[in-house]
Amino acid sequence: MSIKAFKGQRLFKGLSQDFLAQLDAIAVQESKEKGDILIRNGDPAKNFYLLEEGRICIRAERKNHSVSFLHTPGDFFGWSCLLDRPAYSASAESVIPSRVVRIEKKKLDALLKKDPLNGLTFIKNFADIIGGRFLNTHSAHDWFPAIET
């Protein structure tokens, strides 16, 4: 089970069965233990992740504060690679035993280019979700001060 577990998620809305099958073929399921680091801030952005089971804490360290987000099943992270950013801008750690699906950036890029119609749908879905996250983050920031470190 990999991409099939995410079939109903917004990221995959409107994608053809063939495209999903090709995506599934390049996806790798991995089990993570509590405390495992999946991504380190500043590491090369080479993989995109989907959280199938468990909890992943994303922590972005800034000059005078840090921001943390807790991802739950169905969420994705490591999306710096989709924006062609050379490095991740946050770290990701497994908070409890978790199962993720990892997709290598080069393989995902090749698939998106090979099937531009589904590729565009995927990117639009991605942009819609990320845009919503930014709106929610901005709204939360209006109510809660930054965490001082």
Regions from the PLM with identified roles:
Residues 1-149:
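Cytosolic regulatory regions built on CNB/CRP/Popeye-like sensor folds
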